[in-house]
Amino acid sequence: MRHVVPAARLALGALFAATGVGGFLGLLPLAAPHAFQVMLIESGWMKVVKAIELGAGLLLLSNRFVPLGLALLAPGVVSITLYHLLLDPAFLWIVPVIVALEGFLLWTYRGSFRGLLVRDAQPGA
């Protein structure tokens, strides 16, 4: 386990940092983009998504605030999964990789999320 966690963290961080940078620089291939993807790009929302991917990827790569990076990536991982399952199965092969890395790291860092699961949380506590 000594090398597995850093390897998973670096792999997921590199993947999302690269797609974040690629999205900003227009380096990602778009083969016949789906209408949903076009809407995200035209509305400017894709820039927000890519900024979050880049920021969270850099957090994972730097080994700083890793639980925050994982929390920021979680909604994106769900979106990527649903997008490829329902709309664009061409890149479906990447989904198990992303889900496995994110799930493994969330489980590994689960202690950092315990405070979020307090049933009757009090303000300021």
Name the predicted role of every residue range.
Residues 1-125:
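Membrane-interface extramembranous regions
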